[in-house]
Amino acid sequence: KRALDIACIDYTTNPHEDFDIAHINTYGIKSIMLLFRAKRMGKKVVYHGHSTKEDFRNSFIGSNLLAPFVKKYLTFLYRHADLVITPTEYSKQLITSYGVDVPVIAISNGIDLSKYCQSPKKEQAFKNHFQVLPEQKIVMCAALYFKRKGIDDFVKVAEMMPDVRFIWFGETNLWTVPGWVRRL
């Protein structure tokens, strides 16, 4: 939304209003309904292809059993788009390898760097909240509890460096996480 506002481009987030292009960012039931509705209306569809079978695998209990079906479903969705935008060249290669024959381009998910500038006040609030000692080094990760996000390596390194504070930001219902991750 922010990019469209900055560029002074009209848009709607209401799928029942008139639009020229549908940009779909997820793969739930509402997304597939919007995809088919847009196609029936002769509208162009841009799909944000950040989900892949490879990302889905090893993520939740049972994900490896479902992964082949997820791949078929995602391939179906992406093939019905007019354009697929992925965040990385890697995901572009994966999606293209599925036989998706519409244009697939990689555009990084940019961030607003001004939101992440140094702030001594925020740094102190963070250190107080997490009870970080003065001069103590901190290693952080922001991700769900997935092997592909490196949670096992994060824990191993933390065990080897007891003088460094390791903090993992990310929350997942532990009942969906494989047992070996819960035991870390």
Where are the regions that the model predicts?
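Active-site proximal beta-strand in glycosyltransferases
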Residues: I21-H23, R37-F56, I85, I105
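A short helix/loop element that forms part of the nucleotide-sugar donor recognition site in Leloir-type
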Residues: C117-V132
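Acceptor-binding helix/loop patch of EC 2.4 sugar-transfer enzymes
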Residues: Y47-K72, S114-K115, G179
